[in-house]
Amino acid sequence: MATVKWSFSSLKDFINCPKQYHEVKVKQNFVKKVTEQMLYGTEVHKALEDYVRDGTPLAKNYQRFQPMLDVLRATPGQHYPEHKMALNAGKTPCDFDSVDYWVRGIVDLLVVNGSQAYIIDYKTGSNKYPDPKQLKLMALMTFAHFPDVEYIKGGLLFVAHNSFVAEEYERDAVP
């Protein structure tokens, strides 16, 4: 039996509607419709990535996010915007595009500073029901990819609401 390959977003799609997931992802009978909200989210993510990575000026309608982003840019350590990580079925690191990957994901911003790391996931939607499970998955992959990291502070940054949902993870707590 073939190993099921997954990401957090594909798992959410499956949980939301298994039949739709099967029709779109497995059978490929339909293409997932791109909504205005999805386009907006992609555009904002790209603007935030470019600003945090190399200081590309933000468009006027995104300049209100700059104070939050300046804090991230000033965080000590090696910055990895849009950092791709993957694990194989043995839960060891592999290349994101490896044929052997089992799970993979992209961290919006990863900052590694010695034994401590920061994981930031930009969110453009509502902060009413935050779901930090994606942070937990990214933390597990970060521990696997960065063996010196012992402690991770993670957060969902709801940029449109100037809201931050924080999480903390310790390597010792990983089973």
Model regions and ranges:
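Short, intrinsically disordered, charge-biased short linear motifs at domain edges
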Residues: 1-5, 173-175
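Nuclease catalytic cores
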Residues: 4-56, 82-83
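Short, histidine-centered active-site or binding-site loop motifs used for metal coordination
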Residues: 25-28, 122-124, 158-160
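Short small-residue beta-strand/loop micro-motif enriched in glycine and branched aliphatics
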Residues: 31, 118-121, 165-166
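Conserved catalytic core of nucleotide polymerization and phosphodiester-bond processing enzymes
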Residues: 34, 38, 139-144
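Short amphipathic alpha-helical face segments that pack within enzyme cores
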Residues: 43, 133-141
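Catalytic cores of nuclease domains that cleave nucleic-acid phosphodiester backbones
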Residues: 46-129, 133-134, 147-155
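Substrate-binding beta-hairpin/strand module that engages nucleic acids
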Residues: 86, 142-175
